[in-house]
Regions:
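Active-site-facing substrate-recognition patch
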Residues: 1-61, 203-209
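Short, well-ordered alpha-helices that flank and scaffold nucleotide-derived cofactor binding pockets
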Residues: 55, 80, 84, 141, ...
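Short glycine-rich phosphate-binding loop at a beta-alpha junction
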Residues: 60-70
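Conserved acidic residues
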Residues: 63, 121, 151
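Short, glycine/charge-rich flexible loops or terminal/linker lids adjacent to PRPP-binding catalytic cores
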Residues: 75-124, 132-134
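A phosphate-binding catalytic loop at a beta-strand-loop-alpha-helix junction
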Residues: 130-139, 143
Length: 209
């Protein structure tokens, strides 16, 4: 049974919800599942997340927000926050919101009609969480391949301070979960102890085993 708990940690009105256990992602095994389903689906909570992230990008040119992990609602609110400030260099309001498509090899691709939103554009990558930096790195590579320039990587939670050579701005980080751990599946201490995996997790949520 996966039990989601709300930690006594908040940024503005944004709260941190987690489950403790032994979880497996595509790239690692982790001891916390970060639940951001409310922030991704509730407009009020998405706006709260956007308010926390927007100040980092008020003076950064942003043409497109690439929304990974189902964060398009947050991305839309973030665009609104960025263009809404008087100090913003994006005050013309022309920020596009784009979700990636993945091929059979889990590589990001952009169809011909979407490529103009990337090519020669300043792209901000928005993720639900950054645990190892693997997905962030691949996303930066994909944007570069299609001719775009990544101006930042941001997320609700990040276990790393940098990805693809740039700082990751997040609402919550490892200081809020000091015992958060991410392991290569070959070096997972839980597996070595014979502890069963509690759930498989990805950007859509978790599936208990």
């Amino acid at each position: 049974m996966i039990e989601i708990e709300e930690l006594p940690v908040k940024r503005g009105n944004v709260r941190l919800r987690v489950a403790r256990g032994h979880f497996a992602t595509n790239h690692s095994h982790i001891n916390y599942y970060i639940d951001i389903s409310h922030q991704k689906t509730r407009l009020s909570e998405a706006k709260d997340v956007a308010k926390q992230l927007a100040p980092y990008y008020n003076t950064v040119p942003v043409d497109t927000i690439l929304c990974l992990d189902g964060t398009a609602v947050i991305g839309t609110c973030l665009a609104e926050e960025i263009v809404g400030t008087r100090r913003s260099v994006n005050s013309n309001g022309a920020i596009s919101i784009l979700e990636p498509e993945y091929n059979a090899n889990s590589q990001i691709i952009f169809r011909d009609n979407a490529q103009p939103l990337i090519r020669n554009k300043h792209v901000l990558i928005l993720m639900a969480s950054v645990t190892t930096g693997f997905t962030a790195n691949r996303s930066v590579e994909a944007v570069g391949y299609y001719g775009g320039t990544v101006v930042g990587v941001c997320s609700l939670y990040s276990a790393v301070s940098e990805a693809a050579g740039m700082k990751v701005h997040s609402v919550f980080d490892v200081n809020d979960l000091p015992d958060y751990e991410s392991y290569d599946f070959r070096d997972c201490p839980f597996c070595k102890q014979g502890r069963r995996i509690d759930a498989l997790v990805n950007s859509f949520g978790y599936s208990a085993l």
